[in-house]
Amino acid sequence: MSLETSTTTPAGSPLSDRELDLIDKYWRAANYLSVGQIYLLDNPLLKEPLSAEHVKPRLLGHWGTTPGLNLVYAHLNRIIRNRDADVIYVTGPGHGGPGLVANAYLEGTYSEVYTGIEEDAEGLRKLFRQFSFPGGIPSHVAAQTPGSIHEGGELGYALVHAYGAAFDNPYLVVACVIGDGEAETGPLAAGWHSNKFLNPVTDGAVLPILALNGYKIANPTVLARIPHTELEALLRGYGYRPITVAGDDPTDVHRQLAAALDEAFDDIAAIQGVARGGGEVQRPVWPMIVLRTPKGWTGPKVVDGKRVEGTWRSHQVPLAETHDNPEHRAQLEEWLRSYGPEQLFDDDGRLRAELRALAPTGDRRMSANPHANGGLLLHDLDLPDFRDYAVPVTRPGSVTHEATRVLGTFLRDVIARNKDRFRMMGPDETASNRLDAVYGATEKVWLSATEPDDEHLAPDGRVMEVLSEHLCQGWLEGYLLTGRHGLFNCYEAFVHIVDSMLNQHAKWLATSRELPWRRPIASLNYLLTSHVWRQDHNGASHQDPGFIDLVANKRAELTRVYLPPDGNTLLSVADHCLRSRDYINVIVAGKQPALAYLDMDAAIAHCTRGLGIWDWASTARSIGAEPDVVLACAGDIPTLETLAAADILRRELPDLAVRVVNVVDLMRLQPDSEHPHGLPDREFDALFTRDRPVIFAYHGYPWLIHRLTYRRANHAQLHVRGFKERGTTTTPFDMVMLNDLDRFHLVIDVLDRVEGLASRAAMLRQRMVDARLAARMYTREHGEDDPAIANWTWEPSERNSRSE
């Protein structure tokens, strides 16, 4: 367990000649199946010479990384059998999909999951035909692949997913292959630091395997071209002990890799044994493997006079014209026959018994490990009753609170009751986001050195903080995919850093929902706070509500967006999201002192509906009476400004019939034909009318509301105010004025939109224009908002006090 680097040698190999021969054949079988998937439509066992009819007309797939993935898989199987180890396999180079499909088939799992693909010659034909073929399976290690928790299409997340899977899984080892191209990405570079958060007592282990095959699509890789001493120094600096395996002779590499894996697993067992024996938990130096083998190994060495094996040319399809080019087709047949398929499969196309015996059985197969189908292991959270954390509200808009601070007390007890299955992630923002009540039940995970002034750091904390949104999301995804629960809290503007990760997770969920053998997992829950309307102190760089738009673009059955206006609605929404499965939930809530509007019973009813009329804030109250105008709002600050506008209107224009509608569940605005939460037209029209002006104050970019409602009968009368990319360092009210979302402008919108009102209320309009000017002048003179604006509360009028 020292920091010295060791390179294994054949002399120390634990393999007998017989074992080596069998492992080599198993590797050849996986390689044969991989090549067959890329190229063949028929003739899977080469019972006759290859013809054009046997070859796919359109070749898709990636060969270059695949033999390396198959090599590691075969050797991990030996480790699992010999040690009864619990191992899952994460493949960063996910474009090596044919290799993982091949290994799942060799282990028998594939035929168990997809019963139409039998373990015989016809099953092989179907296996080959379906790969990267219309109506078949994709080219990457997607959700369709048994044993996968990581598609590896978009590069950078393999290592962080692996660590997420290992947290709170003390007996699991996650073998994670990292491509040397992927190692150039930012998330992967940060991911090496995950070992500083891995507790050897309560967590499992991650074994990184850096696959140095030297090339990306068309370029060399950085880590393959720096001196090996420099590479090892880099990895030691990250806190790992690298064990190097290098070569291009299969026999030599087999012996090296077997010894390297034995050494690594011995090291892991020793680290965990010491840590679990008692005493102070310290950060260990974990082993890892550097595997330097040729790209496209065992494939064609030269094609059309150009080197292929060991170069970038082997990345995808080394022989690209096999359907129409007889020379390429002959070379493909030679390549396939080089694996000796008659030595690997019997006459019926079944893997020979002595090779099948090399694979683990049951749940120990990496392709059948339940950790890679996390819904099988998922247990409900033991949630406290969120109603016990309610903000007392005797009258709407009269009590001030901090919504996320209220939520923090609830999350504190969620953590206390679920110490083995719930974690909270944040990029150094948990306290800033007013969630620090959680430290009453736990600490922040930290295994590095500490200083006397540090607070809330411990090896066994349930809060994970690192200043990388990529790591926060990646850890959480790995944690969820292996059957646990969590929450990612983040500044609203900076969650955009993981936009693309959300895209990939949404694609995974969409696919897994269509697979009956994939069990539902806990939802990916985002809490976005420190939001656009209260980042007046940090300025434009911190002001961007566009993550909602990204989520709204995703498939309707996956996504939910909630904008609770106060603490009690936030509690109700959070409880709902933590209980949900297979969704991406986005909650946007404020952290600054704000008004509370609904008592808990009213909040629950409102959140259950997803939107509704706030009768106590409306003046259009008579049964059967149509409003003159609808004031709609979504988000805490738009709600505040809408209510303040309604207050002005009821005082200045008492005969104007105003209806206030608040929206919590944004997807309720869509028709029910477009989203499961969507409102039928008749219900939408009942709330928003078919012909009256609707002034909609919205938290984010206003055009999203138009997108969600464009099919509605009254869309032409819908006028939305929201964020228009006008921000700076200023006061809270100046921020809403910059974007025409302020109460005075909302009143002006009403006067301009309600037929016949503009001329009758011209003086009120002028006063609203003057009020905006006065508010701005006050900020320029005093550096803060006018107290009459900043301290506004809702006061009941005689007309509607009865409902309050």
UniProtKB/Swiss-Prot annotation:
Keywords: Lyase, Thiamine pyrophosphate. Its cofactor is thiamine diphosphate. Its EC number is 4.1.2.-. CDD domains: TPP_PK. One of its GO terms (biological process) is carbohydrate metabolic process. It holds the Pfam family XFP_N. One of its GO terms (molecular function) is aldehyde-lyase activity. It is an enzyme of class 4 (lyase). It comes from the Bacteria. Gene3D superfamilies: 3.40.50.920, 3.40.50.970. Belongs to the XFP family. This is Probable phosphoketolase. It comes from Mycobacterium avium (strain 104).
